[in-house]
Amino acid sequence: MGKSILLINGPNLNLLGTREPHIYGSTTLADVEASSKAHAASLGATLETYQSNHEGAIVDRIQAARGNVDGIVINPGAYTHTSVAIRDALVGVDIPFIELHVSNVHAREPWRHHSYFSDKAAGIIVGLGVYGYKVAVEHVAVNFKSREEKAAL
């Protein structure tokens, strides 16, 4: 059975394609989600997408994933720099995750340089534009262990 991946996008990522295209590009979130699902399928994996501008809703979705997905790809948006709650949810469900940022947050304002997630992430993808989603999905599909593989250990 193929791996199951949850792709989470945080606040304002619903504006991809129109918000600051000089930073984030012109590809929409719907385009990112469709191409990510197609890429996952080409690798024998399934991918579910979720986007919310609300911290608690993201926490709820992460908790609902416990025991149901093999890996999470998360672009926490601005919550990267503020959300202990999302960090705790990710750690609490014990699902490996990739932290993803479309822009190079380290080349931007100093307050964007700190992440509450990076030290717990299995990997971090920064500054590759929306291509980073393809890289993240492929990494999870190819390199993460499935729930079945973990159970056999």
UniProtKB/Swiss-Prot annotation:
It holds the Pfam family DHquinase_II. Substrate binds at residues 75, 81, 88, 102-103, 112. The active site is at 24 (proton acceptor), 101 (proton donor). The record marks 19 as: Transition state stabilizer. Belongs to the type-II 3-dehydroquinase family. Keywords: Lyase, Quinate metabolism. The keyword Lyase applies. The gene is qutE. It comes from the Eukaryota. Gene3D superfamilies: Dehydroquinase, class II. HAMAP family: AroQ (MF_00169). This is Catabolic 3-dehydroquinase. Homododecamer. Adopts a ring-like structure, composed of an arrangement of two hexameric rings stacked on top of one another. The keyword Lipid metabolism does not apply. Pathway: Aromatic compound metabolism; 3,4-dihydroxybenzoate biosynthesis; 3,4-dihydroxybenzoate from 3-dehydroquinate: step 1/2. Is involved in the catabolism of quinate. Allows the utilization of quinate as carbon source via the beta-ketoadipate pathway. InterPro entries: DHquinase_II, DHquinase_II_CS, DHquinase_II_sf. Its EC number is 4.2.1.10. It catalyses: 3-dehydroquinate = 3-dehydroshikimate + H2O.
